[in-house]
């Protein structure tokens, strides 16, 4: 086994909590009151969609290569894991890009000096 029993318990707890945290974050962005239609598009159909794909990729990665896997994974498992990791990284980048565009398109969002209106912490 590659991980200790304590580490496996930590992985399980983190994975078990992932769906709830994902749903909470997605709901916050879908319900975010934005005045710009473009910002709303980036929040709901960009960020939220990519977040769903990211959640799916991470979930599938844990199914293909569970932390408690005994022995060496076969080539198919490694290929699937590689694809899911690459997919996750693409969607992390896409999420960041969508958030950047949301902040550019939504009027009234100011710099870090917090002068003027800003989005509430999500």
PLM regions: where:
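Charged alpha-helical initiation segments
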Residues: 1-85
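Short non-catalytic regulatory patches outside canonical folded cores
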Residues: 43-44, 73-122
